[in-house]
UniProtKB/Swiss-Prot annotation:
Family recorded in the similarity comment: Belongs to the PTPS family.
InterPro entries linked to this entry: 6-PTP_synth/QueD, 6-PTP_synth/QueD_sf, PTPS_His_AS
Modified residues (N-acetylalanine): A1
Protein name: 6-pyruvoyl tetrahydrobiopterin synthase
UniProt entry keywords in alphabetical sequence: Acetylation, Lyase, Metal-binding, Tetrahydrobiopterin biosynthesis, Zinc
GO biological process, one term: tetrahydrobiopterin biosynthetic process
Gene name of the record: pts
Pfam families: PTPS (PF01242)
Additional remarks: Two isoforms of this protein have been found.
Length: 103
């Protein structure tokens, strides 16, 4: 029953799938008005996402791309200041991407 409730809850959420074409250019990241230091964001991400270097098919069978985005977003909003997280973007490949905005 718990698994069915979780599956139904996730099924009602919206994920955006994007295909990306890329180009190469340069840009210097300099913004004294950043809302949060990038180092702090990295620390939060490492704490919330225990998925690094895992085989999601074998180690975490629950996940498909959209579910990974929902999992990360739900846990990141608990770590960050209110209304700071805009979206979570998962790159399956360079051209296949899932975007979750908490909707």
């Amino acid at each position: 029953a718990q698994a069915d409730a979780t599956a139904n809850e996730v099924a009602e959420r919206i994920g955006y799938i994007t295909r990306v074409q890329s180009f190469c250019a340069s840009h210097r990241l300099h913004s004294p008005t950043l809302v949060m230091n990038i180092t702090n964001i990295k620390e939060h991400i490492e704490e919330v996402i225990p998925l690094d270097h895992k085989n999601l098919d074998k180690d975490v069978p629950y996940f498909a791309n959209v579910n990974v985005a929902v999992y990360i977003x739900d846990n990141m909003v608990k770590q960050l200041p209110a209304n700071l997280l805009y979206e979570v973007k998962i790159h399956e490949t360079d051209k296949n991407i899932v975007v979750y905005r908490g909707e």
